[in-house]
Amino acid sequence: MITAQMVKELRERTGAGMMDCKKALNEAGGDSEKAIEILREKGLAAAAKKSGRIASEGLVKTYISEDGKVASIVEVNCETDFVAVNADFVNFVDNLAKQISLSESTTVEELSEEKYISDDSKTVSETLVNLISKLGENMAIRRFERLAVSKGLIESYIHGGGRIGVLVKLECEKESEILKEVAKDVAMQVAATNPLFLSKDTVDSATLDKEKEIFKVQALNEGKPEKIAEKIVIGRVQKYYKENCLIEQLWVKDSDLTIDKYLKSKSKEVGAPIKISNFIRFEKGEGIEKKEEDFAEEVRKQIEGK
């Protein structure tokens, strides 16, 4: 019988994941030494040693079905920009983006347990572990999203060779080549301006209340009377909408138009209303703290095998 203590001890000795340790122990009939060999053979122990290292580089990739009705976006991280352009790494991220578009998984954990799209003898997790062992860097599937539309289309935009990725979902009752042009323009807008919300109607009350409080304190700190401060808040809220809500933003290609006005003009050309129903923007490594190390320390760690 495999006990929790056995799994814990093996994990401490190898650094491998809990489930991997449990599987190895079962395969080894409870023999810890044999389980270590199994983990090493699978590259899991070696991968685990790298798992504590910060992976803030990587790629954002998208995939769109031929009919433009289904799309996916994924971010996979690695440690260096050198590995981020490696053909094997790029191929893995491309394949993963396609797999996500066909998948019903909603979490990275679920996706990791799926059979890998280009080699169903391995799971996504096993394929990633093999890639970690081959390229010698920690890697992680960080996040992904999937969009689908029945009437309309989805378009993507990748900026900086995978530094920023965007999906934009348009809804329209009529099919038109103009939709693709509009979606691409909006996707570039999202990449450039990083809006927080689709429209002012989608700004949640907690965020709005917080911003109003900040604006009021700012006005009072500027020496404005209470009543004047309240009027200033109204103006600054409108400015906040214009800066952070996609529909309210000035179009980067023509600052005489807002995105809303641009959509209305294109809707007339198509002969039916065009609506942005969703957008997703991933920026590689955003929110991940990058670890800075000096060269001497890096060499020392390599010599010590860390």
UniProtKB/Swiss-Prot annotation:
It is found in: Cytoplasm. Coiled coil: none annotated. Associates with the EF-Tu.GDP complex and induces the exchange of GDP to GTP. It remains bound to the aminoacyl-tRNA.EF-Tu.GTP complex up to the GTP hydrolysis stage on the ribosome. The lineage of its organism: Bacteria, Bacillati, Bacillota, Clostridia, Eubacteriales. InterPro entries: EF-Ts_dimer_sf, Transl_elong_EFTs/EF1B, Transl_elong_EFTs/EF1B_dimer, Transl_elong_Ts_CS, UBA-like_sf. GO terms for cellular component: cytoplasm. Belongs to the EF-Ts family. The gene is tsf. One of its GO terms (molecular function) is translation elongation factor activity. Its main location: cytoplasm. Keywords: Cytoplasm, Elongation factor, Protein biosynthesis. PANTHER family: ELONGATION FACTOR TS, ELONGATION FACTOR TS, MITOCHONDRIAL. This is Elongation factor Ts. It comes from Clostridium kluyveri (strain ATCC 8527 / DSM 555 / NBRC 12016 / NCIMB 10680 / K1). Residues 80-83 are annotated as: Involved in Mg(2+) ion dislocation from EF-Tu. Gene3D superfamilies: 1.10.286.20, DNA helicase RuvA subunit, C-terminal domain (1.10.8.10), Elongation factor Ts, dimerisation domain (3.30.479.20).
